[in-house]
């Protein structure tokens, strides 16, 4: 381990309209391809920047929804959000135990696969953890995609970089099938994150932090930040303030989670109907 990096504070679930890559502790992370010209992406901002700037061969990020993929795209590196449970989340600051995971980021698919290989494994301290075989870089030395079918949303086909990638895949033997993205409204997505973080963060504080810290709950954190908002929360803390008032029963939570899973599975129907590998 070479070191830690500066990330978007509280996994970018702390404030509204605040810049990606900012934390009160580390300040503003900058994109090495254009400081203050291009965004860093987030929330794993420093992980993407560190790899792009050659500070490290690879880095680890965490993702609930987009926090590995976003900074990977913004910094031109390869990022992977693994299946939840394949990598232990023990010790990770949570947004959502339903959706959180750690994941690898590197400059190439091979390096990302090698790091993924090193990260997977069962951990009894993570209730979602399962034993996954570390075989992620096997077969990457071959260039053929013969017999494989890949789907692409029609709206992305006109992007010049996507076109280049699709042409390379076709040359390697892949079949590319374009389709219109399903129209899915994830109305309860923020509600799910709110419920999970309201429940999961106090558990993390109790289990994994210094016992001398002056807070045990999200409300304590909000009040602590108010003591010096210019230092601790210069862009506000709207999300955390909202979380203080979240009060939903376990039955409502389970119903919300089931609804989200049902909507997500609509994408699997498309994959099955078009006979796609990915």
What residues fall within each predicted segment?
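Short glycine/serine-rich loop/turn segments
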Residues: 1-102, 127
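Loop/turn elements at helix/coil->beta-strand transitions in domains of secreted/extracellular proteins
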Residues: 1-2, 54-58, 108, 148, ...
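Glycine-rich, small-residue loops and helix-cap segments
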Residues: 4, 56, 119, 161-162, ...
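Charged, often glycine-rich, active-site loop that binds/positions anionic groups
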Residues: 16-23, 187-200
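Sec-exported extracytoplasmic/periplasmic mature domains
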Residues: 52, 117-124, 170-174, 194, ...
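A short helix-breaking turn/cap at a secondary-structure junction
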Residues: 81-165
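Short helix-loop capping/hinge segments that flank enzyme active sites or metal/cofactor-binding pockets
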Residues: 144-151, 195-263
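Short connector loops at secondary-structure junctions
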Residues: 175-189
């Amino acid at each position: 381990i070479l070191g830690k990096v500066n990330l978007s504070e509280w996994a970018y679930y702390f404030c509204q309209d605040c810049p990606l890559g900012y934390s009160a502790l580390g300040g503003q992370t900058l994109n090495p391809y254009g400081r203050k010209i291009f965004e860093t992406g987030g929330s794993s901002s420093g992980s993407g920047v560190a790899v792009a700037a050659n500070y490290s061969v690879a880095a680890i990020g965490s993702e609930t929804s987009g926090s590995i993929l976003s900074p990977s795209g913004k910094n031109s590196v390869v990022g992977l959000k693994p299946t939840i449970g394949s990598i232990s989340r023990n010790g990770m600051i949570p947004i959502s135990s339903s959706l959180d995971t750690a994941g690898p980021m590197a400059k190439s698919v091979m390096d990302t696969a090698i790091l993924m290989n090193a990260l997977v494994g069962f951990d009894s301290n993570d209730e979602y953890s399962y034993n996954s075989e570390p075989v992620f870089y096997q077969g990457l030395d071959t260039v053929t995609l013969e017999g494989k079918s890949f789907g692409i949303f029609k709206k992305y086909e006109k992007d010049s970089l996507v076109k280049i990638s699709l042409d390379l895949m076709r040359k390697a033997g892949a079949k590319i099938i374009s389709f219109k993205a399903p129209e899915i409204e994830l109305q309860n997505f923020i509600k799910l994150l709110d419920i999970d973080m309201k429940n999961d963060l106090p558990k993390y504080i109790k289990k994994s932090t210094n016992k001398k810290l002056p807070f045990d709950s999200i409300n304590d954190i909000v009040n602590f930040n108010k003591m010096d908002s210019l230092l601790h929360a210069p862009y506000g803390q709207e999300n955390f303030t909202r979380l203080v008032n979240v009060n939903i029963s376990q039955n409502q939570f389970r119903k919300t989670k089931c609804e989200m899973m049902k909507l997500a599975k609509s994408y699997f129907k498309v994959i099955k109907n078009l006979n796609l590998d990915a």
